[in-house]
């Protein structure tokens, strides 16, 4: 994987999300750059989805807004589910798919941007052939709510 591509994707998404309605970075944040190679990232397994890993870059996905790098094994399929907060993804490697159902799911390769509104029921996963790595930004805590839990009336 090209480090330049990963860095470019992070810069583009960060710039796109630097809107006036967001507070400016504190002096400490803006004066201390974060520079880390992909091999230096510290990975944690996602408790809700065995095999998936994440490396937090900023914030805390357990409690609120965050940015992180996600790693998903090739051939992973996520059943119909939702997340309570909006999530933005920039695909770095692999082919990620998502859609309202399996029939309407679209494939997204490196460089693709996928923005999912909070509470949107969808399927997702990583196609066979290559693990998926993507930059992810959430405007609230990360959660994975299977369709039955997300909508008890179903």
Predicted regions located by residue number:
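Conserved short histidine dyad/triad with adjacent acidic residue
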Residues: 63-83, 115-119
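A short, N-terminal "cap"/entry segment at the start of jelly-roll beta-barrel domains
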Residues: 20-66, 106, 149-154
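Short acidic-glycine-tyrosine-enriched beta hairpin
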Residues: 60-62, 101-119
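Sec-dependent signal peptide recognition
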Residues: 2-8
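Glycine- and acidic-residue-biased ligand/ion/polar-headgroup-sensing regions
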Residues: 73-76, 83-102
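Ligand-binding loop in jelly-roll beta-barrel domains
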Residues: 118-142
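Short beta-strand His + acidic residue motifs that chelate non-heme Fe in jelly-roll/DSBH
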Residues: 78-80, 98-99, 121-127
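C-terminal motif of bacterial Sec signal peptides marking the signal peptidase cleavage site
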Residues: 13-16
